[in-house]
Amino acid sequence: MSMNNKTETLLSLLDEYKALGIAEQIDYNKFYLYSLITHSTAIEGSTVTEIENQLLFDEGITAKSRSLQEQMMNLDLKAAYEQSMKLAKVHADFSVDMLKGLSALVMKNTGGEYNTASGSFDSSKGELRLLGVTAGVGGSSYMNFRKVPAKLEEFCQYINSQRKELLNTDDVISKYRLSFEAHYQLVTIHPWVDGNGRMSRLVMNHLQYEFGLIPSKVVKDDKAEYIQSLID
């Protein structure tokens, strides 16, 4: 399928979605958010289901068959999404501190302190990594950690400049394209020792919420294809 055909298909699906009034159904936005969270954590190894997350989020009922770490991962990501949506609603500018704050929420109960030759940092506080990381065991190395602060600042400046242009347009395709680009760029920079995938998908959805778009969901069944697309 050509790019033009893909664009036409996307626009047609969006029109159909609006015509059906799906987003106006009772609690639709809440349950869609729960689904985003469930699939995002599943890509990172969580086995908590959407039904289990609904019980956990709404009633505080934990799933006996799931580990505490898995459930905390989901609760933390929910808190991060809720904060992200507040920021998106008021069109807050991107900044390194804003991203670190969201990362701190993502990693609040599953992160920890690291001591390295270059110093100590705490991933549960959203602090940037001070060590090298690779894409899995034996995979290629991500950006040198010394370059991360400047690259992250550059990333924020670029996203802000593009956001401000697009907020005043009806260009749905360019808005989606920026959200996907932000996802890819943040994964490439890999600012944190852990939680980069969840943060990249959160930032993608953050921009989509801000632009009034339907948030993109990376489903767990597409995990292998999704990871390969990031590598390619």
Segments from the language model and where they lie:
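FIC/Doc superfamily catalytic core
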Residues: 1-194, 198-232
